[in-house]
C-alpha cells in the first residue's frame, strides 16, 4: 500500500511477537497531539490500530501516530516494520541473499555513519559475526539492543531500506546499554568506529584471539617469558615518522606488531642471581583458533558452533590518529598499502592449531584474505565521515555510503573499480577485517588465477605508491 491509499486492508502475519509493545513504549512514550488530524490520517491510524490488535499488541493512538509520521504516513511500511521486528524478537536471522539489491541505511542526524559502516562490514556479506546475534544476552536492555541489531541485519540482507528512525531506535538501545554516543545535552555524537566494534564485542562476548608472547633478553629465563595474551582487536601502529608521508605496506606494520617490538623495564635475574631491569625483544604469534577465556581467567559463554575456527576473522585497526605534545589531534596522512591477501604463515603458531595435523605430506599454510574495510575521511575520529566496504566472492566489492542519497550501496566488480577501491583503502582504511585461511601450497596458484583482478589491482596500487605524485591513471 502506498502512502496515498487509505482503505486497503493489511494482511496480518500471525508470527508470534513478544515484548514489542515494551520496546515501542520505551522509544515512543505516549504524548498529546498538538494539531488536529485529517480524516485520511485518522483512517490510517485506525487501520494500523486494528492490525496491531489482531497481532495481540495494541498501542496508544499517540504512539501509532508518531510511527506513521516517521514513515510519511505509509501504513504498509509501519506494518512491515512490525512484522520484521517480530521476527527479530523471535531470534530469526535472515541468511545472506545474493539475488537481492541491498538498499542500505539512512544516516541519522549526520552522526550515525560509524554505526552504519561497522554493521555493514560485519554482517552484509559475511556470517562470521552472526554468533553475536544468537548469544544469550544478560539483561533486558542488552536483549532489546540485540533485537534491533537483528532487525538491522535482517532488513539489510533482505534488500529493505533502514530509515533514520530505525537507526535512532538502535542508538537509544545502545545508550541504554552503556554506550556513550551523545553529548551532555543529549544530542547524538559521532564516535570511533573501532570503539563501537569493541563495545559490541564485549557486550555480546565475542571469543578472544589468543596470542603467544615470547620475550628474548640477555638475563636468566623466566616463566613469564612465554605466556598467552588475548585480544579482540589488533591495534597496529603505522611504521615510521608520523610526519613522513612516505607510503608503507600493511605487511611492514604487521612485522612491527608481531616481531619487532621492544619492551623495557622488565625485572629479571642476571647471571649473578641479582634482579635487574632489562629490555626484551617481544615476538607474538597468533594461535589459530578462538578462545573462550582470557589471560585473567575470565570465561565467556561462547558457543563453538557460532564461532567456528574455520571462519576466524582477524580484526585490525590502523592507528592513523594520535595527539601531539599540545594534546591536539592529528592524522597520519601516509598511504598504507592494503593487500587483498597477506602471507601470514610467519605470524601463526601452527603447532598450536586446534585440528589434527595432516599426515599426507602436504604442509598447511596460513594467509589472510581481506573481507571488509571501514574507511574514515577526516582529521579526527569524532568528526568526518565513515564508509563501509565488504567483499562478495562472486559479485565483487560493495560500498555503503549512508550520505549518498542516490545510491547508498554501490557494487564494484570491474578491474578499474577494484583498483579505485584499493587506492581508497590505502589512503583512508581504518578498520580491517581479514579472514584467516588455511591453504595448501599446491592450490595457491590456481586460486590466484581465479582472483586475478584483485592481484592486478594490488599491483596497480603498488605502482601508484611508487609514483611521487601518488596518482594512478587507468587507461
Task: Describe the residue ranges of each PLM region.
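UBL (ubiquitin/ubiquitin-like) substrate-recognition surfaces
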Residues: 2-475
Amino acid at each position: 500500500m502506498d502512502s496515498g491509499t487509505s482503505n486497503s486492508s493489511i494482511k496480518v502475519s500471525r508470527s508470534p511477537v513478544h515484548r514489542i509493545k515494551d520496546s515501542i513504549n520505551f522509544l515512543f512514550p505516549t504524548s498529546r497531539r498538538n494539531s488536529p488530524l485529517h480524516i485520511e490520517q485518522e483512517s490510517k491510524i485506525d487501520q494500523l490500530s486494528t492490525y496491531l490488535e489482531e497481532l495481540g499488541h495494541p498501542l496508544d493512538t499517540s504512539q501509532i501516530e508518531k510511527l506513521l509520521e516517521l514513515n510519511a504516513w505509509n501504513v504498509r511500511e509501519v506494518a512491515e516494520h512490525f512484522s520484521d521486528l517480530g521476527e527479530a524478537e523471535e531470534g530469526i536471522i535472515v541468511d545472506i541473499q545474493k539475488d537481492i539489491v541491498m538498499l542500505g541505511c539512512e544516516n541519522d542526524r549526520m552522526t550515525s555513519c560509524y554505526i552504519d559502516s561497522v554493521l555493514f562490514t560485519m554482517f552484509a556479506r559475511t556470517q562470521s559475526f552472526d554468533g553475536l546475534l544468537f548469544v544469550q544476552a544478560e539483561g533486558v536492555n542488552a536483549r532489546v539492543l540485540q533485537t534491533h541489531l537483528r532487525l538491522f541485519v535482517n532488513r539489510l540482507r533482505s534488500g529493505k531500506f533502514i530509515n533514520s528512525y530505525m537507526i535512532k531506535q538502535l542508538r537509544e538501545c545502545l545508550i541504554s546499554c552503556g554506550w556513550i554516543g551523545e553529548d551532555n545535552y543529549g544530542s547524538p555524537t559521532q564516535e570511533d568506529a573501532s570503539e563501537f566494534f569493541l563495545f559490541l564485542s564485549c557486550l555480546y562476548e565475542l571469543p578472544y584471539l589468543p596470542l603467544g608472547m615470547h620475550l628474548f633478553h640477555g638475563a636468566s629465563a623466566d616463566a613469564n617469558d612465554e605466556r598467552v595474551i588475548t585480544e579482540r582487536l589488533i591495534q597496529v601502529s603505522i611504521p615510521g615518522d608520523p610526519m613522513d608521508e612516505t607510503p608503507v605496506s600493511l605487511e611492514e606494520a604487521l612485522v612491527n606488531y608481531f616481531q619487532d617490538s621492544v619492551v623495557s623495564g622488565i625485572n629479571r635475574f642476571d647471571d649473578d642471581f641479582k634482579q635487574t631491569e632489562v629490555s626484551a625483544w617481544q615476538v607474538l604469534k597468533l594461535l589459530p583458533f578462538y578462545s573462550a577465556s582470557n589471560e585473567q581467567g575470565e570465561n565467556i559463554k561462547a558457543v563453538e558452533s557460532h564461532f567456528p575456527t574455520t571462519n576466524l576473522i582477524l580484526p585490525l585497526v590502523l592507528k592513523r590518529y594520535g595527539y601531539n605534545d599540545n594534546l591536539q589531534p592529528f592524522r597520519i596522512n601516509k598511504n598504507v598499502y592494503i593487500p587483498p591477501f597477506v602471507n601470514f604463515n610467519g605470524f601463526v603458531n601452527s603447532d598450536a592449531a586446534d585440528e589434527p595435523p595432516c599426515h599426507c605430506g602436504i604442509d598447511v599454510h596460513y594467509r589472510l584474505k581481506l573481507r571488509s574495510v571501514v574507511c574514515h575521511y577526516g582529521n579526527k575520529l569524532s568528526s568526518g565521515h565513515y564508509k563501509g566496504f565488504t567483499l562478495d566472492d562472486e559479485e565483487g566489492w560493495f560500498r555503503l555510503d549512508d550520505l549518498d542519497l542516490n545510491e547508498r550501496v554501490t557494487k564494484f566488480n570491474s578491474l578499474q573499480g577494484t583498483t579505485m577501491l584499493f587506492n581508497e583503502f590505502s589512503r583512508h582504511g581504518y578498520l580491517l577485517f581479514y579472514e584467516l585461511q588455511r591453504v595448501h601450497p599446491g592450490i595457491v596458484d590456481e586460486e590466484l588465477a581465479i582472483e586475478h583482478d584483485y592481484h592486478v589491482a594490488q599491483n596497480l596500487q603498488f605502482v601508484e605508491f611508487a609514483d611521487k605524485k601518488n596518482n594512478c591513471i587507468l587507461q
